[in-house]
Amino acid sequence: MEERSMQKAGFLKEPIKHIGITKHNVVPMVEEMADMAFQARNLARAAFIVDLMQKDKECAVILTLAGSLISAGLKQVIIDMLEHNMVDVIVSTGANIVDQDFFEALGFKHWKGSQFVDDSELRELAIDRIYDTYIDEDELRVCDDTIAIIANSMQPGAYSSREFIVEMGKYIEEKGLDKNSIVYKAYEKGVPIFCPAFSDCSAGFGLVHHQWHNPDQHVSIDSVKDFRELTKIKIENDKTGIFMIGGGVPKNFTQDIVVAAEVLGYENVSMHTYAVQITVADERDGALSGSTLKEASSWGKVDTVYEQMVFAEATVAMPLIAGYAYHKRNWEGRPARNFNAMLDAKPVNA
């Protein structure tokens, strides 16, 4: 056992560090990129549009997160955006929020690794690999167990993922855990986080454990309630902008709230006024992740005046785009919407 621990420690030596957006003023570089070509020009235009979302004080900004972003070092970018009131709603995969951000709030880390490795050896040592990044599987099990503990502490019933993630924020506060966390900062700021596929991550393991041992009275996650709550935000704040990192469920879920509002009788609801997506997916296979924002306009989801696709990897493009908007400082004077308070005051009944 001691030999195994030493072998494992040999792999888990250098932690991933999170880059922020407040330190380096990237505005001059991004503005010069506007006169280049290809994805440099697209990135610059995307940065201008994200900045327009900050200038437009009527616009509620929705940030969507897909892909392995927090483990890759983007946590501080998102925390900086939350801290400076640049984001009003987050829609994410469960992995980013639970397996990665909440995991780090528990005191654990992600580690620099290599894609050129014997994966069978990693398996023997209980090390999980995300391309060139390592995670301690034994620590992930602690995260799973913590989700079960939180569920066990709640009144049985159906909750939106947003409501459950608020409880995760409370847990961080009550247990004196690391508050440099997306979950905690959003909890503190009243910014709702939705994970429409919440069970597809460590939350799923924790919740299935909770329900298995509490078959008659237990907590469950109502994804339709997620959809209704997010649609209610669109109805209450008609002008919206979406900054999408990756695609997947968070992208489609967020685009669909325009159509959902129409289905509920709000026929004059506006399409998303502003839209930016960073992706490496291809539009030619017809899948959602690479579908263009112009395509989304045919579905009545996204206006085409201020939209931009950036075909780039998120760890490169997101800090530049978010950093540009931060250093333009048009977020100053944006109203704090605190949609959590709005949803809790006017609950969407399960």
UniProtKB/Swiss-Prot annotation:
**Molecular function GO terms recorded:** deoxyhypusine synthase activity
Q: Which InterPro entries match?
A: Deoxyhypusine_synthase (IPR002773), Deoxyhypusine_synthase-like (IPR023496), Deoxyhypusine_synthase_sf (IPR036982), DHS-like_NAD/FAD-binding_dom (IPR029035)
Signal sequence residues: none
| EC number assigned by the record | 2.5.-.-
**One Pfam entry name:** DS
Q: Tell me which domain of life the UniProt entry assigns to the organism this sequence originates from.
A: Bacteria
* GO annotations of cellular component type: cytoplasm
Q: What keywords does the record list, in alphabetical order?
A: Transferase
Membrane-traversing stretches = none
Catalytic EC class:
transferase
Q: HAMAP family, per this entry? A: DHS_like (MF_00640)
Q: Which family does it belong to?
A: Belongs to the deoxyhypusine synthase family.
This chain belongs to the protein called: Deoxyhypusine synthase-like protein
Organism for this UniProt entry = Chlorobaculum tepidum (strain ATCC 49652 / DSM 12025 / NBRC 103806 / TLS)
